[in-house]
C-alpha cells in the first residue's frame, strides 16, 4: 500500500510539469464542432500459404464529434464511434473522447474524462481514421481511458508538457472493472523547433497490482512545404534486464505534389525478445507475443478532390512478414500482401448551420 501511495504522490507532483498537442493527444483550444466522419474501404489480403485471398468492402469508421465552449474557461469534447464492436467493460468502451477541459490561463490547462493516453509518436498521435497499415502496438493498445491530466503550454505555443494519470489498459485486457486499481502514469512533451517537431513520452503502466510495464515512445518529424518525414521509436520493459528486447520503429514520408495530392511510403519493424508474454493474449504485451519479429512496408497515395478537404480518396499496398520459432523449435516466417482502396468524408454540420 505504501508503494501505491508513493506512486500517487509522485504523479500529483509531476502533474504540474508535463502535455501533448494535435490530433489524438489534443491540447489545442476546442472550437465549436459538430461533425460526422466516415471511412469505407475495399480490401484484399492474401497470405502466402493461403489458396484464396480475403477480400471485400467494409465500413472502417463512423464517428460523431461534438465540442465547444462552456464559458468561464471551460470547454468540452465528445467523440463516439457509432460503428464499433459492443463494449465488454462499460458503455464508454466505444467512446474515444468525453472530457471536460478547464483553462484558467493561457499557459495552464487541466482535464478530466475519457481521453487518449498521453503517449508519444506520430503514428499514435494521428486520428485512427487517418492511419494506414499500422504497427502492432497501434493495433493492440487500448489507449482511450478515463484520465486526469494537467498541461503547461509555453507562451509561444511551441511546447506543451503534460502529466496524466489514467486507468491502465490492462483493466480492459483482463476483463476487469474500472475499480480494479490498475493505473498508468504518463509524462509527455510536444515540441516545435523550426522544421523539427517532437512527440515524446515515458509511462509506467500497471499490468497487475504493483507490477509495472515501462513504455517509452519517442517521435521526431521534419516538416517542410512539399514533404514531411517522421520516425517513431517504441520501447517496452518489465525490468532493467528486459531493456533492449521489446521495441519497434515506424517511419513514414509524404511528398505533396499539390495541397490536394500526396504519395507516401511507410515501413516498420517490431520485435519482442522478452522471456515472457503478459498473459495469453497477444495484445497483452501491446506490441507482440514473446519470440516474434514482424516487418511491414508499403506505399500509397491520398487525393482530396476539393480544397476544403472534406473528401479523401486513398490507395495503398503493403507487405507483412512475421518471424518466430514454433512449438517444435523450428524457425518460421509467414507473410502476406494487403491492398486497400477507400474513401473518407466529413460532414461538418456546424459550418453548414453557420451558412
Tell me what each language-model feature is.
Residues 9-17:
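Bacterial N-terminal signal peptides
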Residues 60, 94, 106, 144, ...:
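Exposed loop/turn and edge beta-strand positions of beta-sandwich/beta-sheet ligand-binding modules
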